[in-house]
Design a protein with these regions (language model features):
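Catalytic core of non-heme Fe(II) oxygenases with the double-stranded beta-helix
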Residues: 128-219, 231-234, 241-249
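Short N-terminal helix-initiation segments at or just after the protein's N-terminus
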Residues: 110-123, 138, 175-186, 250-260
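Conserved beta-strand positions that form and line the central face of beta-propeller blades
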Residues: 65, 192, 222
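Fe(II)/2-oxoglutarate
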Residues: 1-59, 258-268
Length: 268
């Protein structure tokens, strides 16, 4: 009798989450339809180049840096869209991470230009050329597929880590710094992207309009602390050779996303 009573709240909770996930799937289908319109609308406004930058950097160390990958009008449009997003979700993990994030789903409402850029053929072709394999954006239900990382308070940072791969194919992180500056002095912020390879640490340059492509599951990396009167906003995008996932990997991804985007990640 007691066990039956205890099962009632569990079953109710499972049904509630299932209902929320079904409703969210319908919403995602609508957003995917909007994406196609945005690619046409904002892609034309940004006037992304047809030709890729040359030469393409070597990706053998699993990380590559491309300075100035975007024409000024396209970059300015992305930066202005990011600056409109003033309500990032803050997360704090003692001794590891502090900062703000604007999730992929929220960008559809707050900055559709950024969504159109992520889904553009130019970015996909550029990343594929750098990596040496065809890649595609990760799914719309993954809140980390395309997000803004806000470092806007002193001590914002993230410690040493790998990016978990929850997909069947190889998984890549692509960063585009949109703002990286001291607010009172003419210099970059104190926050630095560091990687550790073969027992050595090195800093990766992150001035605005620099594209950093790396295989996060293989490259150990961190971002050092921001100081007072500094601002760093980075567009983070993920691409994959095979963006499909098993049920187990999907469940693990949602659990991870709870730490960054709250309980709503469970029904994405």
């Amino acid at each position: 009798m007691l066990s039956a009573i205890l099962l009632i709240p569990a079953a109710t909770g499972a049904l509630a989450i299932t209902g929320l996930r079904l409703r969210q799937r319908r919403r995602y289908r609508r957003l995917e339809s909007q994406q196609r319109d945005w690619i046409t609308q904002y892609g034309a406004a940004m006037d992304l180049p047809q030709a890729l930058p040359e030469p393409v950097p070597d990706f053998q160390p699993r990380i590559a840096v491309l300075p100035q990958p975007l024409p000024t009008p396209a970059f300015d449009a992305l930066r202005e869209a990011a600056l409109r997003c003033q309500h990032a979700e803050r997360s704090y993990f003692p001794a590891h991470k502090q900062g703000g994030t604007v999730a992929y789903e929220d960008l559809h409402r707050l900055a559709p230009e950024i969504v159109a850029f992520y889904q553009s053929g130019y970015v996909r072709r550029l990343c594929s050329a750098v990596i040496g394999q065809p890649v595609a954006p990760t799914p719309i239900h993954d809140q980390s597929s395309c997000s803004l990382l806000f470092y806007d308070r002193p001590r914002d940072h993230i410690g040493w880590h790998y990016d978990h791969n929850f997909y069947n194919g190889r998984h890549f992180t692509v960063l585009l710094p949109l703002v990286n500056r001291h607010l009172k002095e003419d210099r970059l912020s104190s926050a630095q992207l560091l990687i550790r390879q073969d027992g050595h640490e090195r800093a990766i340059p992150t001035p605005p309009n620099t594209l950093i492509v790396f295989e996060g599951a293989r490259v150990f990396h961190k971002v050092t602390r921001l100081e007072a009167n500094e601002l760093r906003i980075v567009l983070s995008m993920t691409f994959c050779t095979h963006p499909q996932a098993s049920l187990l990997k999907g469940a693990l991804r949602r659990c991870k996303d709870v730490a960054y985007f709250g309980i709503r990640a469970l029904w994405t």
